[in-house]
Amino acid sequence: MWHFCEQVYECFEGYHRDYSVQTVPVEYLASHYIVNKFRPDPLAVLWLFCLGIWWEIIQILHHLFQYKEPALFVGSCQNLAAFLEKKYSMEVIQKEGLAASALKDKERLTEKAVVNQPLSNLIPHSNKMYERSKSLLSGLKRGLIKQKEIAFDKLMGGSTIDFQHIPTGTLTPGENKVLDIPIVPQHLLTSTNITDYHQANKKNANGATALHVGAIEVIMDCFTSPDSNICGGMLLVDTAHLNPDNAIRSVFVAPFIGGRPIRVLLFPDTLVEIAPNMNSRFKLLCTTSNGDVAPDFNLAMVKVNVAGCAVSLTRTYTPTAYLEQELIKEKGAIVQYLNRHTFSMHRNNQMTKEEMQKQRLSFRLESALTLQEKHPLHATFCKSTNFVYKIGGDAKEGSNGNLTVNESQLSSHSPSAHVLHKHNNSGDNEVEFSEIGVVVPGAGRTKAYGQNELDLAQLSLDDTSSLRGTALQTKLATSRIILSKTMVGNTVLREDLLATFLQDSNERAAIDLIRTHVIRGKIRCVASINVPENTGCALAICFNSGITGAADTDIYTTSSQDAIVWNPACEKAVELTFNPNPCGDAWNFVFLQQTKAHFAVQCVTGWTTTPLTDLALVLTWHIDRSLCVPKTLTISSAHASFPINRWMGKLSFPQGPARVLKRMPLAIGGGAGTKDAILMNMPNAVISLHRYFRGDFVFEITKMSSPYIKATIAFFIAFGDITEEMTNLESFPHKLVQFAEIQGRTTITFTQSEFLTAWSTQVLSTVNPQKDGCPHLYALLHDSATSTIEGNFVIGVKLLDIRNYRAYGHNPGFEGARLLGISGQSTMVQQLGTYNPIWMVRTPLESTAQQNFASFTADLMESTISGDSTGNWNITVYPSPIANLLKVAAWKKGTIRFQLICRGAAVKQSDWAASARIDLINNLSNKALPARSWYITKPRGGDIEFDLEIAGPNNGFEMANSSWAFQTTWYLEIAIDNPKQFTLFELNACLMEDFEVAGNTLNPPILLS
């Protein structure tokens, strides 16, 4: 029977713990006993059955007496709902009106004869977290007898504690509000007589000396409106540590709004020494996003629930599997109620194996002082022997982390020797160990030295880590550029290989730059110049991955990769941080030299007013702390953000009240330039591959004239050929841009809501803008341009990126598509199998019977063709999107499908006597072996189709004809027998889905065929 009572008590206690109510249904006891216990007592089961019958009778009487109108209690809640639905239907209300008792009936229907339960605590009970004795006596003592509050000096080890609703204080809005998280009620702590560990004896050896804090629940009852926008952040700080990496335990973010309280559950798993200051061990740092609370009101009331277990010298806590495998791993959580978004993060600063190998541990054992005679009239106290044991590598940063041991010689190791001591002159008997390991034999004064006192392997001479440190320690070079007082726009101030900018230097990190193999930090270029505000100009610093031939350095091409355009009259200093290897996460100096990475400093717009003297622009180069991140573009994949860096143009507005309107096309796949040649960059070439596109356009507006010249510009999207004479232009959705005194730049965004459909990337230049159906970006002088000095109001417009980029179809391209400068996680849909023409070659017709052979070589990446001296070759190179991309993309990776069509003259099949051999090679050396060969002997020609996989050493990317890693390119060598019959060769190309590009190469203008 005692065993049965103990089981009933455990059921009673478990239900009270799980459901937080004061009464326990007998059905729960019976079901729990019958299901969970395999050998029930029949008498006990009969007793529970009778008790259950009485319980049902009591519940029925409770329901009957609760309702004042017994007629409403019709069998069940379903009948009640049906009754009310029939009584208060919409038709009845429209005819008879709403009864006065409708709200009461609705309240009864909502309650359904069940009283709402209060909001319960979420902290687990201590008996769920700690194992404890399950004897009947201890169970009755814990549950049936109300436990009194015990002072901590009488608390025994192994005892569990549960403190509810410990008051903490109130929280006021603002930053850095600190609250102590009490672990025990303060009145218990102050009445405790704390004893020291060393004073423990047999009588009080089981007395609690520490408290293991298993769980803390912080409850915040907010006094704010439930619909307010106040958001709060909380840091749980352990003040036993000084290092923030160890002190900050958890971070919580939640809305501080009224309604249900904020409940933060913490599982510190921390042993706290019982001491007068133990309640100040944990602190909660709170801050709010705004202080929208009146001064006379508090933000919230805070209270704490704690569960833990006492620890003594002889007894410790035993965690349950729930605590060890679930709660400790979870570390903490914050309750997320409906329509509340919360966030929690937990810090982990545990030492890794590599960090442990870098630690230095030193052990020093000093002997007692002994009186030693110096001379007959003088004696002093000295240490006869000392022991020093050191573990760890070099304390300096960058050590290899190997463990080393240095041990002094002990007198006990060699009876005839003693450790050599060097006493300093101060007489404080401190021993210097500069000659540890030097042994003096007792019979003489001969010195003996060990042979391997220094381990060369520990010097870390093979350290390959990247450059790091402060800006001074990582300073690579300084460049000084003179700006003439007569400087005009479109002037290149200095351009050169990036390696040339960096190598001529005596700065601290110059040698490290040249001798380091792998550098993972970005390059940071800081440009500074002082320009008076009554003048102004526009300067640009630009980085590109490569340069070919007599490349054009127009701002359209140079600013397409990594660049910044600024007005030094508004911004005295700017910085450009970039990754010189867009395909990888590291680089080095030789890489910059052999890939021909290019850097340019140029003037976009000249002086507004002429300065009295020349000026100096200073560039300082550093290794930035931010790591290099690859930046590549996949042709067939969607891009959440497409970094286009498209220079849209320079807009000039004369001073005065006259209306001035500028137009910039958004069909941006046609490049820039004139009618006979175009300029192209890599991002624009990628755009031109697609037939149609749309997205969110982000423009950067830069002021290029003096800050003293003022104007307000309205930007809007419109179709057709709009002129200044048209009225109501600002009826379009528009954005007004008005620069402050020292503001040099701003950004504006036009989302997809401005555009009904997508539009073409390229438009024929012969099509009137009124009929092209493509949007344009217009800039209208809103009020007037005016100043106290002469000069126009000049701004530069640059399309930074296209967000939520969507593209449709593949574009074969146009010759002479509309160019720049006409003025007064999205889905990619691509049509595969669409080819772009690359080039067409017609053989020379001057061949004779004696010279019946011709050959030519074509570079597949650069689209350059060279023929032999047989005669005049007719060569046509098409500026198609794929051909342009292969030229301007510095790094390429993936598969290209080529189609070579060989056409013959119209001769009889019996008269056909021509053939062609085609070799695919990657080097023009006569020792290079072909990768593939074809022979065509069919009458009147034929065609071949082949896939070419571009794969290189830089994370799979290849740079054509680069000295770095001896990278070559791909050629077609075509030898023709009887070129009078084989007359025409055409090459088409199609990019496959895995094709990727990175970086921009500066090229000469591309001639239109």
Curated annotation (Swiss-Prot):
Gene3D superfamilies: 2.60.120.20. Pfam families: Como_LCP (PF02247), Como_SCP (PF02248). Residues 387-393 are annotated as: Involved in tubule formation by the movement protein. The record marks R468 as: Interaction with the viral RNA. The record marks Q451, N452, Q825, S826 as: Cleavage. Changing D562N: In strain: Melon. One of its GO terms (biological process) is symbiont-mediated suppression of host innate immune response. GO terms for molecular function: DNA binding; GTP binding; RNA binding; structural molecule activity. GO terms for cellular component: host cell plasmodesma; T=3 icosahedral viral capsid. Keywords: Capsid protein, DNA-binding, GTP-binding, Host cell junction, Host-virus interaction, Inhibition of host innate immune response by virus, Nucleotide-binding, RNA-binding, Suppressor of RNA silencing, T=3 icosahedral capsid protein, Transport, Viral immunoevasion, Viral movement protein, Virion. SUPFAM superfamilies: Positive stranded ssRNA viruses. This is RNA2 polyprotein. InterPro entries: Como_LCP, RNA2_polyprotein, Viral_coat.
